[in-house]
Amino acid sequence: MEVLRRSSVFAAEIMDAFDRSPTDKELVAQAKALGREYVHARLLRAGLSWSAPERAAPVPGRLAEVCAVLLRLGDELEMIRPSVYRNVARQLHISLQSEPVVTDAFLAVAGHIFSAGITWGKVVSLYAVAAGLAVDCVRQAQPAMVHALVDCLGEFVRKTLATWLRRRGGWTDVLKCVVSTDPGLRSHWLVAALCSFGRFLKAAFFVLLPER
């Protein structure tokens, strides 16, 4: 019950930021909440489970809308380049036994993704990469690594994306990337942008990382 109460309070604090200009701290908290939901959805799709106390309370209102859009755009991206987001650890030639190895690899790919600027397409790719790694971790009996990945995602957002997000009014700006004509959500111009971006991301995966 205490975990549920704290989760409800935490969710309320996150949602409060959607009603005004969010601070960097709030943007990071929202990024991590979205990361947990995105990863959880991808794990469920893979027939896997993961325990996260922060998920005890349902994702509220606008945050749920943002998450739904990220997941839908992620679906589109994965259809365009399915091999890029599967078996991520194997593509990066890394072991999942060491947290520094996993987080360093994620940050290396994230750095390449955003080396030429920031777009919503690249943000979706960031979440897809994190989820792909999370699936690998759980499959290899390393569920604790998922928490580390979510924290790492939040730190990357703080250092690299927070200013960009704040200028756009926060995470809800991604809702402009789709035209919602029905519950299925029809993708807008972002999908075309994701298609051209796929080749760049594919190349990023094959950058040699330092040997461990």
UniProtKB/Swiss-Prot annotation:
Entry's induction text: Up-regulated by DNA damage.
Residue numbers covered by motif BH2: 164-178
One Gene Ontology CC term in the entry: nuclear outer membrane
Renumbered ranges of motif BH1: 112-131
Keywords linked to the UniProt accession: Apoptosis, Cytoplasm, Endoplasmic reticulum, Endosome, Golgi apparatus, Isopeptide bond, Membrane, Mitochondrion, Mitochondrion inner membrane, Mitochondrion outer membrane, Nucleus, Phosphoprotein, Transmembrane, Transmembrane helix, Ubl conjugation
GO MF annotations in UniProt: BH domain binding; channel activity; protein heterodimerization activity; protein homodimerization activity; protein-containing complex binding; signaling receptor binding; ubiquitin protein ligase binding
Motif, BH4: chain positions: 32-44
Lineage: superkingdom: Eukaryota
Motif placement: BH3: 66-82
Glycyl lysine isopeptide (Lys-Gly) (interchain with G-Cter in ubiquitin), cross-linked positions: K25, K32, K159, K176
Region of interest called Nuclear export signal, as start-end residue ranges on this chain: 70-78
Annotated spans, Interactions with ITPR1: 15-45
TM stretches of this protein: 189-209
Tissue localization of expression: Expressed mainly in oocytes; weak expression in granulosa cells of the developing follicles. In adult human ovaries, expressed in granulosa cells at all follicular stages, but expression in primordial/primary follicles granulosa cell is stronger than in secondary and antral follicles.
GO biological process: apoptotic process; cellular component disassembly involved in execution phase of apoptosis; extrinsic apoptotic signaling pathway in absence of ligand; intrinsic apoptotic signaling pathway by p53 class mediator; intrinsic apoptotic signaling pathway in response to DNA damage; male gonad development; negative regulation of mitochondrial depolarization; negative regulation of mitochondrial outer membrane permeabilization involved in apoptotic signaling pathway
PROSITE patterns associated with the record: BCL2_FAMILY (PS50062)
Post-translational modification: Ubiquitinated by AMFR/gp78 E3 ubiquitin ligase complex; mediates degradation by ubiquitin-proteasome pathway in a VCP/p97-dependent manner; prevents from pro-apoptotic activity; promotes degradation of newly synthesized proteins that are not ITPR1 associated.
Alphabetical list of Pfam families matching this protein: Bcl-2
Location of Phosphoserine modifications: S7
Domain remark in the UniProt entry: BH4 domain mediates interaction with ITPR1.
Family, per entry: Belongs to the Bcl-2 family.
Subunit structure, as described in the record: Monomer; positively regulates apoptotic process. Homodimer. Heterodimer. Oligomer; promoted by apoptotic stimuli and BH3-only proteins; mediates constitutive activation. Interacts (via BH4 domain) with ITPR1; enhances BOK expression and stabilization; limits apoptosis and prevents ubiquitination and then degradation; protects ITPR1 from proteolysis by CASP3 during apoptosis. Interacts with ITPR2 and ITPR3; binds most strongly to ITPR2, and barely to ITPR3; regulates their expression. Interacts with XPO1; translocates to the cytoplasm. Interacts with BNIP3; promotes oligomerization.
Protein name stated in the entry: Bcl-2-related ovarian killer protein
Name of encoding gene: BOK
